[in-house]
Amino acid sequence: MSYEKVLQAGKTVVGTKQTVRALKEGKALEVIVAEDADPSIIDKVMEAAKEANVPVTKVDSMKKLGKACKIQVGAAAVAIIR
């Protein structure tokens, strides 16, 4: 379901740095994180999402999340933005 949401989203940013930036700038509507990503990386995204009061959805695979974003590598985090 969330993979489909990413595929259908008009605008997204991919990666933890860009996701955290979008959250801090108030641009993120929703965040999707991969459960198989390194927890120390995802914790930064989760904390920023909590501070910004943005919902977080977890998916099982970085590889599938990357594929949904149409990139050839895995993605730990993706933000759907305005």
Curated annotation (Swiss-Prot):
Keywords: RNA-binding
Stored Gene3D superfamilies: 3.30.1330.30
UniProt superkingdom: Bacteria
Family matches, as InterPro entries: Ribosomal_eL30-like_sf, Ribosomal_eL8/eL30/eS12/Gad45, RNA_bf_YbxF-like
Molecular function as annotated in GO: RNA binding
Membrane-spanning ranges: none
One Pfam family, short name: Ribosomal_L7Ae
Family membership: Belongs to the eukaryotic ribosomal protein eL8 family.
Identification of the protein by name: RNA-binding protein GWCH70_0105
